């Protein structure tokens, strides 16, 4: 990123981990406009914690989502669901992700810099970077249509479309 910044192919506003004052200082130093960027935050496409989703197996290996995913996708009943071992929390340098009591990561949008580390580390590709002003997103990555997912997770998306109508 630094090379692209110095070469002029990106503006300082694209630096997600720096403060606004820091981005302005970089712009002043380089003699360029800071530019503008809509703040993004990490969003998780799973709400299936241990209180609403079943496990199909008791995984007892290394406490890591990466490791659990290698062992037949982990123990979660929902194939697409969060494995809940906290790799995302461990990789977040900004202390923006905490595991809730039901083993689901919760993102503190005030602390999230949209650095993308959680996106990279999640073996289920459940994190994405979304504009902070987008308040509606589907917190489920189930790709099947219909009610079958509800046998695995009480809050699984059935693709009914009701959320799009509201």
Please annotate each region the language model reported:
Residues 1-166:
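Ferredoxin-type iron-sulfur electron-transfer modules and their immediate structural context
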